[in-house]
């Protein structure tokens, strides 16, 4: 509704671009793209994506959720916006319905399949997952860290509020949850599809659905992008069906108290007695056309640190909180300055305001500033793909590995595209080879100094899927040849997994070398050329990723010895356990014990970081170099002297805690 004359409003929904047919449950107004103009974030329930209406600066808005939020909650409920990590940026949290305990997850989590996510993409919906989403703002790109932050599962949740409850200087998080009946209980859902349900009355249905009251959840901000559940230790574990909530200093002691609205029950009022830390409360009196100073921003500075807060009372779900801004200070005894941005053009500053008070500040545009474009951190990298002529798009086939193995943690049939770089044409510039998926040609991107020229590598079999590549001089003619590793978790024909070697004529023209590799049929993950037998030619370690249709059985990693240009499988002679080392994702050579011989570092899925130590003419497993309790989902290894002390260190990439 557009305010026409201060007394009347006009419906301009359609012409403003805000027409929305979703089940919208809440909204928040803030500057999503940091251009100085307020945008609108709308939380939508069910399958429809939430919306980020970006202000076009002409009275219209355009939904561009995908450019800023790469995935979302599936059934988005309440939303709150605040700077929880004190970097000056607005962060966002949206709520969903994922239970906290393993038993309730199995009881309540709906059956999903990968085809559903394909349908989302087909209908231009963005990826959505049944969990809370916490977005940390990094210069208008929002990274979702709810699992890392430990706030992703709080059951059927409604209203989130980010505020500093213990006055330590960092905003904590309180979430209301509950629903009178467990409508998503899988037993009830299955019953509704049965014959008996046809004869049931509405009351019969209601009586069958379980009633489960749950406590709301209070999280302490640990100041490291993680939150700690303090519901019990802060004595707030009261079972309820809670929806709206509001914050206010009800007893005028300086800290924030909480009012919670409960369905068919008495409201909660939580008096805050957590700490005696210092604080500052700020009440802004705005101009005549904005008396509450809505969307004004206050920033306080102390030493090298600062906090920000914005006057935005319309937060959470079906709720409005006060307009007084609260800053916890911990044990700090002074504030250097307080800056108020009344709007995009006017600001004022107060030096050394007293603490432990309610500071009331009347509108005073003493300083004119140009904030129409918020200053952004310069980017470290600039994409130059188009300028350099890197015209390539990987075309992956649809693969549904979960149909054959529902307990797989990921799809192993789309591990590509593989990529390798080297001076293939001998002109002094690095060229690039990109491996194609099944049905797609691999390509050679030849660099001529000013850009790249694309050539299809027709010698590589398009019936196979390229998942690993390595460049090295196979035939000792002074140029780089190509080892092509194939793989696909859905191939049941061994010949589709047989790796190949392509020989380079020195100008980037490749032909397949017949009969140089022995027959072995595994999904390749890494190729390492090195001289294992000391005869001055290059042998090969070829690690294996997964065994098709036999997950999680270990595939066989092989060691191939170069004998007069033909590779012989010497795996049993050199590798422990006949090469059945696990589902390997990466490997690197490194002289671990300083004996002058190359050892092998390996890692993979459901395993740790392991050393294959060279002992005379074979390798043995030696687990004494790494901690025993580091099993996990490891992806990659990089060897480098990171601390410049003359020895080699490791960077090992894991699936991570945000998962």
Regions found by a protein language model. Give the residues of each.
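Beta-propeller blade repeat segments, especially FG-GAP/WD-type strand-to-loop junctions
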Residues: 1-12, 49-64, 106-111, 131-143, ...
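Gly/Ser/Thr/Pro-enriched helix-cap/hinge segments flanking short amphipathic alpha-helices
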Residues: 141, 211-217, 221-418, 451-452, ...
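Short glycine/acidic-enriched loop and turn motifs that connect beta-strands
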Residues: 47-48, 98-101, 180-182, 266, ...
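Short loop/turn motifs that recur once per blade in beta-propeller domains
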Residues: 10-22, 62-75, 115-126, 143-154, ...
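Hydrophobic beta-strand segments that make up the repeating blades of beta-propeller
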Residues: 35, 39-44, 92-95, 173-177, ...
